[in-house]
A protein has these predicted regions:
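N-terminal acidic leader/helix
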Residues: 2-30
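Short, mixed-charge low-complexity intrinsically disordered segments
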Residues: 39-82
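Intrinsically disordered/low-complexity terminal segments and short unstructured peptides
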Residues: 1, 7, 27-28, 64, ...
């Protein structure tokens, strides 16, 4: 049975801070969530739990993870939130 894991990311893109959400169907490590979300090619750690992008210009980290129901997943997708 697949799970619905709502992951909230914090990103530093240039001078801007940004947050985004994505729904994954398997529980994994914070690095693997970042790797899948940003297509990271290698583990380039800026500090504990924070990773550089492939160019070494922007940073990403997992802010939170939460298991959600199938109904919550459908609602978030319908609203375009995740």
């Amino acid at each position: 049975m697949t799970k619905n894991i709502l992951v909230t990311f914090d990103m530093q893109i240039g001078d801007y801070e940004h947050s985004d959400k994505y729904i994954f169907h398997n529980k994994t490590t914070d690095y693997n969530y970042c790797k899948q979300f940003w297509s990271l090619k290698k583990k380039n750690k800026l500090e504990e739990g924070v990773y550089w992008d492939n160019q070494g210009l922007n940073a990403i980290s997992v802010y939170s993870t939460q298991e959600i129901t199938e109904q919550e997943t459908k609602t978030l997708k319908r609203l375009g939130v995740a």
